[in-house]
Amino acid sequence: MKRKPGVRELELGAASAVPPKALPLPPPTGEAMAMLARRGLRPEKTTGDLPFPAQLEEHVAARLSEWLGHYAFRLFLRGAIQKPESFLPVETTRYVALERSTEYAEASVDLGLAEISSRGRYTLKYPARSFGGTLEWYVGRELARRFGFDVETGVKLHVPGLGGDLDVVAAAEGKLIYLELKSSPPRNLAANEITAFCDRLNLLRPDLSLFVVDTALRLSDKILPMFLEEFQRRGYGISGKKRIAAQLWALTPRIYLVNGSRDLMMNIGKAIAAGFRALAPEVL
């Protein structure tokens, strides 16, 4: 049997070892990123995929955020992004009347997002690949503005086997909140996206997590059953599942399913409030 090294040999070996190199990453900025670092992760902020400059003047950002609070405007902008060459207002979405979509196109010009090209057509000045980055920007900004969270969006973790970025992470009251945002309608969501979300929860262990689908459609038809099936496959308990409001579900006291019906940020706020109450100590 091979002899184990003694105390002296262990100490000599450790003392003669080459000092470890410092990680080539800047220190985390903000409490949300610091909480990820304390979990042994290497969070890195990515460049946002936005149809506007990342550093907007505050008065422009405030007006844009106000427009994004309208579900119809989000539908319009999502459709405009899908037509990078040029678009007519009526081509952006079939769910918004021509008069309103024209108003949104003119607002986009006023905000500096678009310009008039020719024959009533418009072109986005800063093409984006999808609406996802804009949704992250809006939700992150409103979490900070309305609730005082420290927020980061589009965070890469450099973890093998864990694809994609963290859409939104937020910190307050010593708690870490993770939000995954989906800008596609429920019919476009696949089971592997639910699986990936649960994998991220296992890695992050956030105090509170929200799976947010920016749609007015019912989540109980497809998305909720997909979550229950995934939870059952993983052996998670689902006895605590309950509806908090219309299409706002508490899958567990820490995991919430949210849609964008009527007021997206109000729905997110309700889920956060329910989660914070569930995590709070008993009064008596």
Predicted regions: what they are:
Residues 1-284:
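Intrinsically disordered, low-complexity Ser/Thr/Pro/Gly-rich regulatory segments
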